[in-house]
């Protein structure tokens, strides 16, 4: 069987088209007037998941020592990417979910704030990490994740997402970081 190019399936479908074709559109979720893009059908399709992971890590190959996933769907991507690149996986969790010594970072939500945490001993200072998540919206969550690693002395090699909601300008929260998004809406 032929190997596919990064970002394409074996049928040579560009990864953005593949994601768009599998992504489910759910009107009025989580509240009326919102059109939710559900990526779980992409993750449920083995060939699509492989294409997504390959396309996310390809631009950063050899530039990271571990892959971090942001709770919760980022865990799926990070675990697959870490396995594919023979690196470790790091979890960035919501507050109160990690049992050992943590560092915390607050970030703004539409109505309030939230907190992310990271075990301080998971990556030594000087390490390099690739941060993955499913969606880049306002950039609050991914910006907080990047700040956590930087505060631990870990270099953020890049940030990768499956889908970017361009109108929300999330990249502005990631200024100074390389961002890879596979589908921009």
UniProtKB/Swiss-Prot annotation:
Cross-referenced Pfam families: Pribosyltran
Coiled coil regions, renumbered to chain: none
Signal peptide: none
Entry's Gene Ontology BP terms: adenine salvage; AMP salvage; purine ribonucleoside salvage
Reactions catalysed, as given in the entry: AMP + diphosphate = 5-phospho-alpha-D-ribose 1-diphosphate + adenine
Entry keyword set: Cytoplasm, Glycosyltransferase, Purine salvage, Transferase
GO molecular function, one term: adenine binding
InterPro entries, alphabetized: Ade_phspho_trans, PRibTrfase_dom, PRTase-like, UPRTase/APRTase
Gene3D superfamilies: 3.40.50.2020
Predominant location category: cytoplasm
Gene Ontology CC, one term: cytoplasm
Catalytic activity, EC: 2.4.2.7
Subcellular location: Cytoplasm
Keyword Cytoplasm on entry: yes
Keyword Glycosyltransferase: yes
Pathway: Purine metabolism; AMP biosynthesis via salvage pathway; AMP from adenine: step 1/1
Description of how the protein assembles with itself and partners: Homodimer.
Family: Belongs to the purine/pyrimidine phosphoribosyltransferase family.
Summary of the function given for this chain in its UniProt record: Catalyzes a salvage reaction resulting in the formation of AMP, that is energically less costly than de novo synthesis.
Classification via HAMAP family: Aden_phosphoribosyltr
Protein name: Adenine phosphoribosyltransferase
Gene (name only): apt
């Amino acid at each position: 069987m032929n190997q596919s190019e990064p970002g394409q399936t074996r049928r040579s479908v560009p990864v953005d088209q593949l994601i768009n074709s599998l992504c489910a559109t759910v009107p009025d979720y989580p509240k009326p007037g919102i059109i939710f893009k559900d990526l779980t059908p992409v993750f449920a399709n083995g060939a699509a998941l492989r294409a997504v992971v390959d396309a996310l890590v390809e631009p950063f190959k050899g530039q990271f020592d571990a892959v971090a996933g942001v709770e919760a769907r980022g865990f799926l991507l990070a675990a697959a990417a870490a396995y594919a690149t023979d690196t470790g996986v790091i979890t960035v969790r919501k507050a109160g979910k990690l049992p050992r010594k943590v560092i915390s970072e607050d970030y703004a939500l539409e109505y309030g704030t939230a907190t992310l945490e990271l075990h301080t001993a998971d990556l030594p200072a000087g390490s390099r990490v690739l941060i993955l998540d499913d969606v880049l919206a306002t950039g609050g969550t991914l910006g907080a994740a990047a700040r956590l690693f930087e505060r631990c002395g870990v270099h953020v090699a890049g940030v990768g997402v499956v889908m970017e909601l361009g109108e929300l300008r999330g990249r502005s929260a990631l200024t100074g970081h390389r961002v890879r998004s596979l589908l921009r809406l």
